[in-house]
Every structure is written in C-alpha cells, then in structure tokens.
A protein has these predicted regions:
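Glycoside hydrolase catalytic-domain groove-lining segments
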Residues: 121, 127, 275-334
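Non-catalytic accessory regions flanking glycosidase/transglycosidase catalytic cores in CAZymes
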Residues: 1-181, 185-238, 244-254, 261-266, ...
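Anion-binding catalytic surfaces of enzymes that hydrolyze or transfer phosphate/sulfate esters
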Residues: 260, 264-276, 280-283
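Histidine-centered active-site/metal-ligand motif
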Residues: 184, 214, 273-275, 290
C-alpha cells in the first residue's frame, strides 16, 4: 500500500542545530603513500550479472591475496579531483586508516622502511595532503603511527617523529585541526599495534599523546576512541547461524570500556565507525554480517545506521559528555564496499544515514572514501562521479543545519527528513525517501515548491538521474546543472525514488 505524506511550510518544531560539515569524508592513508587496498570489482559484478567469488579460497588468509592489489599514490594535485571535491563546500577530511598505524614518517627521504614499520610517508606526500586540504577549504583530521617500529608494547609511546609531523605541518602554514590517536583500536591484533599490545597499553599511550597535544596544540581537537562496536549486519541471518568468524579475522578484541576506563586525559569529541555490514570480499569469514542485495531497501537494512548511532550515544555521554559524535568511517560495507556500493541503490542508505543521524545527535559523518575502492564518491584513478557523489552534493546544497521534527514515523515508502534551507532563506528543505520497490508515495505540497527528484533506470545503475536527466560530468569535468522543477499540488514518488523538496 502506497504512503501519503502532507508537508508543512509553516514553522516546525526544532530538534537541534547540527555541524555545518555533517557530510565529510576520508582519504585513506594508503592512498597518500601508495600501497595495498581492495581490488576493484568487475563491471559485471557491479551490475549483479556475475557472482563475486574469492578465487576458490576456503579461508580468509588464502583469500586476501585475491582480494587486494597494490595502488600507486593518489595525485592530490589533480585538477579534476580538486574541482569535484571543492563542489561539496567546506568539509572535514580525515587522513587515517589502519595503514596509518604502521607508517614511518620518512622526513629525510631515505626511502627505507625501518624494522617494525610496514610503509613510509614522504615529506612531499604530506605536503600534498596539506595543499589539498587548503585548496578545498577543508579541515584536517589525522591519526598517528603506533607500532613495533615506534615502541614495544610495554614501553611508552615515542613522540619523536610525531612531534616532527606537527612541526612540519605548522611550519608550512597549515594546521592539524583534529586528531584521533589510532584507527580502530578495538582490534588489538590486526590494527598494527606493537606485539602483545593490551587495552591498558592503549589507555597509557592515548593519554600520553592527547596530553601532549593539549599542552602544545590546544586548538587541535582530541577525538576518540574510534570505536568499532555497534549494530552491524543482517539480524535475520545472525539468528540462523553462529555469530563467530569475527575472531578468525580480527583476533583479540577490546571493548570501548576496556580502552577508555583507564584514561585520564579528556577527549573533545567521541568517534566510532559504522558499516552496514561486510562486503562480499569478507563474506567467507563472516557470512552473518553480509547483506543480500535484495534487502538493500528494506527497513531492516536502513535501520542499521541509526541503531549504531543509538548504541554509541551512551558511550559518548559517558566519555565525552556534551560532545559531538563523529562517525570517522562510514560506508555500506567494511571490506571496500559491496558490489553495489558504487550504484544508485546505495544512495538510499547514504541519505537515510544523514537524515537519521542529524535527527538523533550532532556531529560529522566521514564517508569512506572520497576516491578509493567501490564505496568511494569518485572512481579510483579516473575520478568519475558516482551516484552517491551527486546525492551528498545535493544534500550539502539544499539541507541546512537546523533540524526539524517532521512528525512522520519512519516507514517503508516514507523516510522524511526536514531541515532549514541551506541558502539561509525562510522556509523548509525536505528529503523524502521512497524505499518501496513496489508502491508509489504521494506527497501533498502546501505551496509552490522546488523539487529535485532522483531516480535511475535500475537499482544497480551506475548513473543517477535528476528530474529525468542523467547526472554526468561534461567534457570539461564540470558538474552538470542540478536545477529543480517547480511544482504545486501533489508530488508523486514512484517506487525506489527520492526527492528533495524546498519551500
């Protein structure tokens, strides 16, 4: 049965004001230095006409060789990349990832990876990051190295190279606006820590680092703990099969409480990671965490992001009372994204996450990634735009920072979110998601409205349409005009369509 919605253009109840950089993103550390990351899916796998497999491997260790490939460093001076990134307006850029935890800062240009590290970052590469952030008028969030090359687990964190990272940054005229200590510390065995590292070691070292930051760079926000706990995966599958398998991949795990209870230096922002599940690449080891593609528009699938937020809110209140929550990695699936991550169907999850998060709390969502792997806004290497790029670009252009109560319960066919207008004019901006694959949603407009309707030829289309016109770059890599149509009366949202409505 189709849903009926009546919008209001009169004053609505204000829920909160949210960060104007709510929509932000990651540039993976391995992109900056060059290195291994997830091997791209084939066009047939993306279209859903070819099943993904891990090359006959029967365990994750054997599979990894088929799942990864080596990529050269990203060119952060690329004119097309900068132009497309700048379209978003001011954002946060997070340069981090597990790769960062094991990277040596090769400020002297030796080209040698010291024992205990796995990768090197050159001074030129770091300056490239700073130039990119400045060119697009962004703010920078980082994490630092903490591995056997830095110190043994029962020794204090060696700050020598870390201090140099800050010195080089500030001598260049840039700033480190925020920092996490390390990426995903819950996974003690695989995140890159010194051998034998414990939750107690983590608490000691986070205090040492954040204490030093607060003393020497008081304007830098201390963010953490980069928690990986929370709701994830298909609950129906989890009810039918054991939840085990995570340990086979992640090894020894620590809870957020175990990491944080021993700390003494307060944080400024609470952070966690959200993925809706795990991709086909890791389904072999964690099948209960992988979603089948025919569930991507279901209420169960779309409920994961707000459930993960609600799980972390009490932890935020405990460890950073009154602080913002930052989702410092967000995507459809851990493991580089699902085969459908780069297609139209993931737009529903992305916009629903932005809407539900802003309804629940204040903070920033760092989409993983800007231009790496299948969940990137842009295709790796060519920087071709994907549906999610245009979806969040419209969000940033249309949806303001004041969040209103729509008085509409979230339900199939009617995920409705209301904000102030981004242009600052009086009125209301709505995002309305019809996630039903079979039924039409009707929307009654109380006044003349500007409508931006999103659709595609198929759910797994790699090109999205705005008011019937394909959203693709022109021959000069310019973003197409994204103009609304003016409507009055009744707006019809066909199955699996989305509309921004501005009044």
């Amino acid at each position: 049965m189709g849903q009926n919605i009546t919008l209001k253009n009169s004053p609505l109840q204000v829920i909160r004001t949210v960060n104007d950089k709510l929509m932000s993103y990651n540039v993976e550390f391995t992109e900056v230095t060059g290195g291994t990351f997830w091997k791209a899916y084939t066009p047939e796998q993306i279209a859903g006409t070819e099943k993904f497999n891990v090359g006959g491997a029967t365990d994750i260790a054997a599979a990894m060789a088929n799942l990864m490939q080596v990529y050269p460093p990203i060119d952060l001076y690329n004119e097309k990349l900068r132009k497309l990134a700048k379209e978003f307006g001011p954002v946060w850029v997070r340069v981090s990832g597990t790769w960062a935890t094991k990277t040596f800062y090769d400020w002297d240009g030796t080209g040698v990876i010291p024992e205990g590290y796995q990768n090197i970052l050159t001074k030129e590469q770091w300056i490239g990051v700073l130039d990119f952030v400045k060119a697009i008028d962004a703010k920078l969030l980082i994490s630092i190295a903490n591995c056997d090359g830095n110190h043994k687990h029962d020794e204090p964190l060696d700050m020598t190279l870390i201090k140099k990272l800050y010195e080089i940054t500030y001598e260049y005229g840039s700033t480190i606006d925020a920092t996490e200590f390390v990426n995903e510390p819950n996974m003690l065995d695989i995140t890159g820590f010194p051998v034998g590292y414990t939750a107690e070691d983590y608490s000691r070292d986070q205090d040492a680092y954040f204490g030093w930051v607060k003393e020497n760079y008081p304007d830098t926000l201390c963010v953490g703990p980069c928690n990986t706990e929370g709701t994830m995966g298909d609950k129906e599958k989890q009810a039918e099969m054991p939840v085990g398998g995570v340990e086979a991949f992640s090894g020894n795990m620590a809870s957020c409480d175990q990491l944080m209870e021993g700390t003494k230096v307060p944080m400024d922002v609470y952070s966690y990671h959200y993925y809706n599940g795990i991709s086909e690449r890791l389904e072999l080891v964690m099948p209960q965490m992988h979603w089948d593609p025919d569930k991507t528009l279901t209420e169960g699938y779309l409920s994961v992001a707000p459930a993960c937020c609600e799980y972390n809110m009490p932890l935020r209140d405990k460890y950073v009372p009154g602080g913002e929550m930052w989702v410092t990695e967000s995507g459809d699936a851990g493991g580089g994204g699902n085969t459908w991550a780069s297609t139209y169907v993931d737009v529903f999850r992305t916009l629903n996450e932005l809407g539900t998060f802003a309804t629940l709390t204040d903070g920033v969502i760092f989409h993983n990634t800007l231009a790496s792997s299948d969940y990137g806004f842009l295709k790796h290497g060519t920087f071709e735009t994907r549906p999610n790029y245009y979806a969040v670009l419209l969000w940033n252009r249309i949806m303001g920072t004041t969040v209103y109560n729509t008085e509409e319960e979230l339900r199939e066919g009617a995920h409705v979110f209301a904000h102030s207008r981004r242009d600052g004019k009086d009125g209301v901006a709505y995002c309305i998601i019809n996630n039903s694959e079979t039924d039409t949603t009707t929307v009654e407009l109380p006044a003349s409205a500007e409508v931006y309707k999103l659709s595609a030829d198929t759910l797994r289309a790699t090109v999205m349409k705005l008011n019937g016109k394909e959203l693709v770059l022109d021959e000069n890599d310019n973003v197409p005009e994204m103009a609304p149509v003016v409507m009055e009366g009744t707006l019809t949202l066909e199955p699996a369509t989305i509309a921004f409505v501005v009044m």
